[in-house]
Swiss-Prot record:
This is Small ribosomal subunit protein uS5. With S4 and S12 plays an important role in translational accuracy. Located at the back of the 30S subunit body where it stabilizes the conformation of the head with respect to the body. Part of the 30S ribosomal subunit. Contacts proteins S4 and S8. One of its GO terms (biological process) is translation. The gene is rpsE.
């Protein structure tokens, strides 16, 4: 996969990052048909993040399709002063990611596709490790699955019928 780092600020206030562009080939009776597949993430810098894939005969069209799909598929993740509330694990296929909060000044310690997600969603301090498959598509999905599973202390307290102070100890 070609590593393409394109970051754009759109007028709607969303941060966009291209994770990669692949050239794919379909072999038919008359020869080969070349097209391009793009993977991108979009975030609002405040915990919102979405992932999109686009496929077209030309790179700019594939990139635009990926960005549009990412905008439509955004999810909201609660952040705790630029980091996460607790450690989470996400799995998609053979890709497994481990994500944990980090103290102020640590920065984003994560590889490739995960780093792009954290940058666009506004996370400034996080530790992340990818175990198993490092296929960008699966790593992005595993990361989003892990982030979806994260709960705030208020949500946990509400489920248990306790106060937030009791949960935090």
């Amino acid at each position: 996969m070609a590593k393409v780092e394109i970051e754009q600020q759109q007028t709607d206030g969303l941060r966009e990052k291209m994770i990669g562009v692949n050239r794919v080939t379909k072999v038919v009776k008359g020869g080969r048909i070349m097209s391009f597949a793009a993977l991108s993430v979009v975030g609002d810098g405040d915990g919102g993040v979405g992932m999109g894939k686009g496929k077209a005969r030309e790179v700019p069209v594939a990139v635009q399709k990926a960005m549009d799909e990412a905008r439509r598929s955004m999810i909201k993740v609660s952040l705790n002063n630029g980091t996460l509330y607790h450690a989470v694990t996400g799995v998609h296929g053979a890709a497994k990611v481990f994500i944990q909060p980090a103290s102020e000044g640590t920065g984003i310690i994560a590889g490739g596709a995960m780093r792009a997600i954290f940058e666009v969603m506004g996370v400034t301090n996080v530790l992340a490790k990818c175990i198993g498959s490092t296929n960008p598509y699966n790593v992005v999905r595993a990361t989003l699955n892990g982030l979806k599973s994260m709960n705030t202390p208020a949500e946990i307290a509400a489920k248990r019928g306790k106060s937030v102070e009791e949960i935090r100890g």
